[in-house]
Each structure stands twice: as C-alpha cells, then as structure tokens.
Amino acid sequence: MAKKSLIQREKKRQNLEKKYKILRNSLKKKITETSSLDEKWEFQKKLQSLPRNSAPTRLHRRCFLTGRPKANYRDFGLSRHLLREMAHACLLPGVTKSSW
C-alpha cells in the first residue's frame, strides 16, 4: 500500500492538470500559429508561468485500490498483483486464465 501522502499528491496533480488543460492547450496553439518571434516569447513566458504540476507529463498512473505506481494495467486501473488476485477470484468479468 502506498503512502497516503503520495496518493494525495497525485490527486492534487490531476486536479491541477484538469484546471489548466484548456489554458495550456490554447497557449501551445498560439505559439505554433504565430509567426512573430516576440509574440512566441510572450506566449512561452505565460506557459512557463503556469504551475509545474499542471503539466500532463507530471501525472503518474497508480493502482486505484493500493496506490502502487508501477506495473499498472490501463484497461483495469489495477496493479499486476491485484489484477491476478481479482482474476483468480472471478471478480473481473470477461477475464479468463489462458491455457494452451
């Protein structure tokens, strides 16, 4: 189980990313569309003034039950440990153990 503070930090980053997503995308679009170098510098400064944690690259996918940061499956939102346990317990519909 991950520390509660790390899980809360990740939730804070997700909220910041949602809050600044539209503004960040519009600034990036303006940077690519303008031809004037001075305007590009101005938009770039505005983009850099946004909070660092509002960038989507700062987000990290975590298991939503345990908060484990590594070995997560996107389709389920679970870590590999919980995916295996829940699949064996038939708690994930449509997931079967393969055998060949």
From Swiss-Prot:
Q: Does the keyword Plastid apply?
A: yes
- Role of this protein: Binds 16S rRNA, required for the assembly of 30S particles.
Q: What is this protein called?
A: Small ribosomal subunit protein uS14c
GO cellular component, alphabetical, reads: chloroplast; ribonucleoprotein complex; ribosome
Per the similarity annotation, which family is this?
Belongs to the universal ribosomal protein uS14 family.
The species is Marchantia polymorpha (Common liverwort)
On whether Plastid is a keyword of this UniProt record, the answer is yes
- Gene that this sequence comes from: rps14
Q: How does it assemble?
A: Part of the 30S ribosomal subunit.
Phylogenetic placement of the source organism: Eukaryota, Viridiplantae, Streptophyta, Embryophyta, Marchantiophyta
Pfam families from the UniProt entry: Ribosomal_S14
Keywords on this record? Chloroplast, Plastid, Ribonucleoprotein, Ribosomal protein, RNA-binding, rRNA-binding
Q: Where in the cell is it found?
A: Plastid, Chloroplast
Q: Kindly list the biological process annotations in GO that this record carries.
A: translation
Instruction: Please provide, alphabetically and separated by semicolons, the GO molecular function terms listed in this UniProt record.
Output: rRNA binding; structural constituent of ribosome
